[in-house]
Every structure is written in C-alpha cells, then in structure tokens.
Amino acid sequence: GYDEDDFADAEVNKDNSNFVISYIGVLSPQYEIDTFIAAVKQLSKTIQQKLLIRFVGQVYQGSKDKLDNLGVKIEYVDYVPHKTAVSYMLSSDILLLIIPNISDNKGILTGKLFAYIAAKQQIALVGPVGGDAANVINKCGMDGVFAYGESFSLSDFIEKVYNNEICCLNYNSKYYSRKFLTQQLSEIIVD
C-alpha cells in the first residue's frame, strides 16, 4: 500500500501547455517499452505536439535511445526524494506503469501501483492483462490495462484521456493505503 502522509502536503504543478505522461521509478531492460512507443507514434500530430513524456528515475540507455527517436518532448529526471516524485505523479495526466516482461509476472504488485492509485490520475498499465496489478486497476474502475503489443488500444486510451472522454475517477484510494491494509491484515491474523 501507499503511505497517506506522502500525499498530505505534496505540491501539484499542472502544466496546461503540455499533456504529461509520467513514468516514476527504474526502467530496466525487462520493462518492455515498445508497446508504449508504438502507441505514441499512432497518436495524432496535435496530441504529439502537446505531449510531454517524463521519466523520473533511472532509465536504461537502450530504452532512452528508442524514446529519443519519437520526435516528442521527453524529459529525464534523475533520482528525486519521494515527496518530489509524488508531486510529479500529481502533476501528470497519465501515469505509465509497465510490468516487467518476465516469466511469472502475473503476481507482480509494485509499490508504485499503490502510489499511482493514491495520486488519483489515470493509469496506463502495460503488462499481463490477467495479472494482479491489472486486477487492482480494474477494481478501481479504470480502463487503462493493456497487454504487451496492444499499442492501438493504448493509443486510443491516451487520446480519450487527452480529449477528456475518460476523466472521472470515483474509487476510494484509502482502501490501498498501508494503514487500511495493515488493519485488514491484523483482523485476519486475530481471527
């Protein structure tokens, strides 16, 4: 789960001149970026011109080489304190989450997923559709789950968010807080 205190005083710096998709954390070679790159290439020129893709954290050089050839604005931000990373999340239009393309990846639940949920921004997940991370996103009522290679669906999702056709997030993020989850676990243990 996420720590509610991390979001208490976080700054929001929305930049209306850009449509911001952010990835927060390490992007190593196991994280399949090709689906996202193909989706960005399929976006309309209007969206591509307003698009800012922001990576906060370490990015594998091979992925940077692919991304830098996209012809859109890309920003690489090295390691920042967690509070600053939270501000980047809150200042984004879409948060990109990629599950590593490795065997037995359906059970991967990253801490980043819960922080993204707490940020209450649209999440675009690329990974196993039947995996645990996808199930959490689906339980929140979000539509942003895409299998590796589903670039057309991902591109369509990005366009819908850009055009405000997908906007309202009506889930209660507290169900994914560390405090709530710890309370639930303690009740199970006590019973």
Language-model region placement:
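Carbohydrate-associated surface elements
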Residues: G1-Y2
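Conserved donor-binding/catalytic core segment of Leloir-type glycosyltransferases
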Residues: N13-Y31, I37-V40, L181
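Nucleotide-activated donor-binding/catalytic signature segment of Leloir-type glycosyltransferases, i.e.
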Residues: N18, I47-K50, R54-G57, G62-S87, ...
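Conserved donor-binding loops in enzymes that form glycosidic bonds
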Residues: Y23-S28, Q58, D78-Y79, Y175
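Nucleotide-sugar-dependent
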Residues: Y31, P81-Y88, L95-I117, I123-N135
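A charged, aromatic-enriched C-terminal amphipathic alpha-helix characteristic of glycosyltransferases
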Residues: G149-S155, Y162-V190
